């Protein structure tokens, strides 16, 4: 199928599930900042007037979890009159955290394939499959639909925080549909933005008048600024633009829907454009390959595309709990590769060390929270873990690796 419409969505930091992801990763940042060897699997639940922290943590760090939770909720924007019914200062915060199972800890600390190589000593924290993807549709080598959906969500949050549109509240979602012809993006078919707002705007309470006001404001202050540097731009006469299609969006955030860590895994990755292994990222320390190996798979895929060895690349990795080396490595280039997929796999095995300890070392994952002032993983917990133009993410820095791949591939050309 060469002609089609593909759609991806994003959500703002005030979405209930994203509140949870940010809290879980804020806990991770705090623990790793004090104790880089912390083992963390932190899950968060939010509902009307309630936040629950649960999971398994083994760490020497001392963290005031209740204070941390309230600060994250406050920074997102749920405080006082702008809280939309969920307030950082008054919500109940419950903490129910246990230690990591000694059976799991044993497998991670002493890998089944242990030998004299220190990086073989750390086994994978669980079994699982992870996918990484890259394509040449955008400068950051991400699919255009998810890239544009994130741009809109980021800009929507920005105009709220800066009070450019002072009637906006924290919860919101974006969705973008792109027209493809012969497999290439050619135009923006539809943009959908759902955003929480006050029940009254400048004295206006009529539902349709409010919706029209929001629509006009969002086109001017969100859509245009978010897309002004793109080659493919929305056209006000051709691009379908939908805003709050149900009519109004006053009740939102945890007051409107319960939230849970790990429920936006497609938003976190490639917007459905590539396959997903099923594992979430937030609240998990780097020994959890759901997170670290997914970052490594993106690193590999992006390096391949950056080296111009393929226009599209999807990499699958699989692991067994307590075993350091990947069980399997698979690369798919969708008939866009300049060398065979078997040759690409050889290059991957030669140039990328995909054992958990090696990934952690390559990306400095244990020490980045402290290096970044206690806030690293939390910043990835909204607006995507890949292709971020606003963050310095080590798995996105592929220039050096891509150059080596390009040089090494010459023997196959």
From Swiss-Prot:
Binds 2 divalent ions per subunit. The keyword Glycoprotein does not apply. K(+) binds at residue 43. It comes from the Bacteria. Its EC number is 2.5.1.6. Mg(2+) binds at residue 17. Residues 100-110 are annotated as: Flexible loop. L-methionine binds at residues 56, 100, 257, 288. Its cofactor is Mg(2+); K(+). It is found in: Cytoplasm. It catalyses: L-methionine + ATP + H2O = S-adenosyl-L-methionine + phosphate + diphosphate. GO terms for cellular component: cytoplasm. Disulfide bonds: none annotated. Pathway: Amino-acid biosynthesis; S-adenosyl-L-methionine biosynthesis; S-adenosyl-L-methionine from L-methionine: step 1/1. Belongs to the AdoMet synthase family. Catalyzes the formation of S-adenosylmethionine (AdoMet) from methionine and ATP. The overall synthetic reaction is composed of two sequential steps, AdoMet formation and the subsequent tripolyphosphate hydrolysis which occurs prior to release of AdoMet from the enzyme. This is S-adenosylmethionine synthase. It comes from Prochlorococcus marinus (strain MIT 9301). The gene is metK.
